[in-house]
């Protein structure tokens, strides 16, 4: 049995990750790929969802940047080992809302955590496991945050200042440029053009890898 492929959707808040899922799924179906598993990070298992709550919501004490990072990796390893790897082994495709690139950008870039720590933790937890394909939806932080604020109450991460998101975006752009399996999508465009670019990118990946 062929193993499945792991596609990840990345981007800042308000970039349109949620609507991208359906475009990816529809494109996979066009190529006869119907067994698709959805994941989100942090989350995706009972333990990981509890950690998601602690990461996203205000709690009774200050959550340090390192504590936040460790909770994210604890949630990630649960999801990878208990959900993603088994699904891929069964030949299913996995479409993930965020993966390790988020931590590298948000905690490594936004929080400014030590790069040696980031790399060491990534290697210890994930080893050589990584997505087969990453769609990075690039958006100006001002535009993305305006969209998010229009939805209502903000979570703990969304409440960070604009400089935090500019640092996060800068790290995203740096890492995406270095990753041959990542594609940058201009999410500042009208939604129709964004979805068109996503469809083309996914089609190209399928044609080259299936």
Swiss-Prot record:
**What's the domain of life for this entry?**
Bacteria
Instruction: Identify the CDD domains for this entry.
Output: TMPK
Q: Which Gene3D superfamilies match?
A: P-loop containing nucleotide triphosphate hydrolases
Q: What is its EC number?
A: 2.7.4.9
Catalytic activity, reaction form: dTMP + ATP = dTDP + ADP
GO MF term (any one): dTMP kinase activity
State a GO cellular component annotated for this protein.
cytosol
Annotated ATP binding lies at 11-18
For this UniProt record, the keywords arranged alphabetically read as follows: ATP-binding, Kinase, Nucleotide biosynthesis, Nucleotide-binding, Transferase
Q: ATP-binding as a keyword?
A: yes
A single Pfam family it belongs to is Thymidylate_kin
Tell whether Nucleotide-binding is among the UniProt keywords.
yes
The GO biological-process annotations, alphabetized, read as: dTDP biosynthetic process; dTTP biosynthetic process; dUDP biosynthetic process
Annotated NCBIfam families: DTMP_kinase
Q: Which family does it belong to?
A: Belongs to the thymidylate kinase family.
Q: What does this protein do?
A: Phosphorylation of dTMP to form dTDP in both de novo and salvage pathways of dTTP synthesis.
Return the protein name. Thymidylate kinase
Taxonomic classification: Bacteria, Pseudomonadati, Pseudomonadota, Gammaproteobacteria, Pasteurellales
